[in-house]
């Protein structure tokens, strides 16, 4: 029986391996060999190599879109070949949905049962946002030679310590038998900057540049704006890195900004405050990067 309780096991695969050689194909070939009939969905293989925080952003919302029991094989492994092992966790999708309840109860066909999913990843912080947004039921260090090679290739732990065991788990191998159970303190996490709210002003950071469009994503969520009394139509001043100000109303779409090139403030598909130019790049002309400070003021 597959991990999702059906005859069609699913692995969603994210990595930094790229698609210019056969690395991803090797991983997927092993997945199909170990778990015949598996459906392997490519999430992304072009993330910035070794960027754990970027990878974490790509995997946190996945349970909203996949059937219960899906195995998420997620990897960027800068410490390949070292004592850094993989961790396998069972998470339960939040009752209000994987992205703070955006679609909960909407009846639009996207809401899933409050069921469990398995993530497997290097224990290097990649699961930070997953664990914070969803919580988890149980976590294990992946060490059993029933699911990983006895002598793993030291330069390719993404294959040996993530792809291979993900296939065994998708095929129904018991999660509790992949290795010893981990205490919460043993799961590596990175620091996530907090959003500060003072009246109708908020402070946060740029979390990502939305390639290839050049839009700017922040860590300020819809719920943070609501706490500050800010909603659609509110005119805002947003200052980046203390020196670069932009002004516009918060609107649902880019087109609401008007002419091409006009500034648009909007909530991205993940529910976070973002900045853009209508049909043009905002980030690239200024060479803006993740990590910049963001200040939002209602006007």
From Swiss-Prot:
SUPFAM superfamilies: Bacterial fluorinating enzyme, C-terminal domain, Bacterial fluorinating enzyme, N-terminal domain. Its EC number is 2.5.1.63, 3.13.2.3, 2.5.1.94. It catalyses: fluoride + S-adenosyl-L-methionine = 5'-deoxy-5'-fluoroadenosine + L-methionine; (R)-S-adenosyl-L-methionine + H2O = adenosine + L-methionine + H(+); chloride + S-adenosyl-L-methionine = 5'-chloro-5'-deoxyadenosine + L-methionine. Keywords: Hydrolase, S-adenosyl-L-methionine, Transferase. InterPro entries: Fluorinase, SAM_HAT_C, SAM_HAT_N, SAM_OH_AdoTrfase, SAM_OH_AdoTrfase_C_sf, SAM_OH_AdoTrfase_N_sf. Adenosine binds at residues 16, 77, 155, 157-158. S-adenosyl-L-methionine binds at residues 16, 21-23, 77, 158, 210, 215, 269-270, 277-279. One of its GO terms (molecular function) is adenosyl-fluoride synthase activity. PANTHER family: CHLORINASE MJ1651. Homohexamer; dimers of trimer. Catalyzes the formation of a C-F bond by combining S-adenosyl-L-methionine (SAM) and fluoride to generate 5'-fluoro-5'-deoxyadenosine (5'-FDA) and L-methionine. Can also catalyze the hydrolysis of SAM into adenosine and L-methionine, and halogenation of SAM with chloride to generate 5'-chloro-5'-deoxyadenosine (5'-CIDA) and L-methionine. In vitro, in the presence of L-methionine, can catalyze the two-step conversion of the non-native substrate 5'-CIDA into 5'-FDA, via the intermediate SAM. Belongs to the SAM hydrolase / SAM-dependent halogenase family. NCBIfam families: fluorinase. This is Fluorinase. It comes from Streptomyces sp. The gene is flA1.
């Amino acid at each position: 029986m597959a991990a999702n309780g059906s005859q069609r096991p699913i692995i969603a695969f994210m990595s930094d391996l790229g698609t210019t050689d056969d690395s991803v194909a090797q991983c997927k070939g092993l997945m199909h060999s170990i778990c015949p009939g598996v459906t392997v969905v490519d999430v992304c293989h072009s993330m910035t190599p070794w960027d754990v925080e970027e990878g974490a952003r790509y995997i946190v919302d996945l349970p909203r879109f996949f059937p219960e029991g899906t195995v998420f094989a997620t990897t960027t492994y800068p410490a390949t070949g070292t004592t850094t092992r993989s961790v396998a966790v069972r998470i339960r999708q939040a009752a209000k949905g994987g992205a703070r309840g955006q679609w909960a109860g909407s009846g639009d066909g996207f809401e899933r049962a409050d069921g469990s999913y398995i993530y497997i990843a290097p224990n290097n912080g990649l699961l930070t946002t997953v664990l914070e947004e969803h919580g988890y039921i149980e976590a294990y260090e992946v060490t059993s030679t029933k699911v990983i090679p006895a002598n793993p290739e030291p330069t390719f732990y993404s294959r040996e310590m993530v792809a291979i065991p993900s296939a065994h788990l998708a095929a129904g191998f018991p999660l509790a038998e992949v290795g010893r159970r981990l205490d919460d303190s043993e799961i590596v996490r990175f620091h996530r900057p907090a959003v500060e709210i003072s009246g109708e002003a908020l402070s946060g950071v740029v979390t990502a540049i939305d390639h290839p469009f050049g839009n700017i994503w922040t860590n300020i969520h819809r719920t943070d704006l609501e706490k500050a009394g800010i909603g659609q139509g509110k005119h805002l001043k947003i200052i980046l890195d203390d020196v670069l100000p932009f002004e516009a109303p918060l609107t649902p779409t880019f087109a609401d900004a008007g002419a091409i090139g006009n500034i648009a403030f909007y909530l991205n598909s993940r529910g976070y405050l973002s900045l853009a130019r209508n049909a043009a790049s905002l980030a690239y002309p200024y060479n803006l990067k993740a990590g910049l400070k963001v200040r939002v003021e209602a006007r």
